[in-house]
Regions:
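Amphipathic alpha-helical segments typified by the pilin-like N-terminal helix
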Residues: 1-7
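Acidic, glycine-rich loop-and-strand cores that form catalytic or ligand-binding grooves
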Residues: 34-70, 74
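Short, solvent-exposed coil/turn linker segments
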Residues: 25-29, 47, 56, 108
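Short, surface-exposed interaction loops/tails
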Residues: 66-109
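Generic hydrophobic secondary-structure signal
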Residues: 9-12, 16, 57-60, 64-68, ...
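Alpha-helix exit/C-cap motif
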Residues: 7-34, 40, 66-71
Length: 109
């Protein structure tokens, strides 16, 4: 499952950068605080991203991602993806997840 997590983290960071290239800016929801990414699309009747203070990356769909990847252990009904995103002090994007056996899965770009 960690291989799948690594692939998902790469998909997210690639989509964010493609969005930034096309729009000359990062999605505004990304802050300097590492925050869990919202599982967009699992519930369209209530904006649970803001209720649960999760990062809403719906601006990436459908042009950059068909849907936001979620951890393989997460259910479709979970509000969060178990993947986290933030800008570091140098302005780079960090996308990370928690792997099995305590492994940290992270890409900084």
């Amino acid at each position: 499952r960690n291989t799948q997590r690594q692939s998902s983290v790469a998909q997210i960071i690639n989509a964010v950068y493609q969005y930034a290239i096309d729009n000359s800016s990062l999605p505004t929801a990304i802050t300097t605080t590492s925050t869990e990414i919202c599982n967009n699309g699992y519930n369209t009747t209530v904006n649970l991203c803001s209720i649960n203070t999760l990062v809403n990356l719906s601006v990436l769909m459908p042009d950059y991602l068909v849907k936001i990847p979620k951890d393989p252990q997460r259910m479709d009904t979970d509000a969060g993806t178990n993947f986290f995103i933030n800008r570091d002090i140098y302005g780079r994007i960090v996308v990370s997840g928690i792997g099995e056996n305590g492994a940290t899965i992270s890409i900084t770009r």
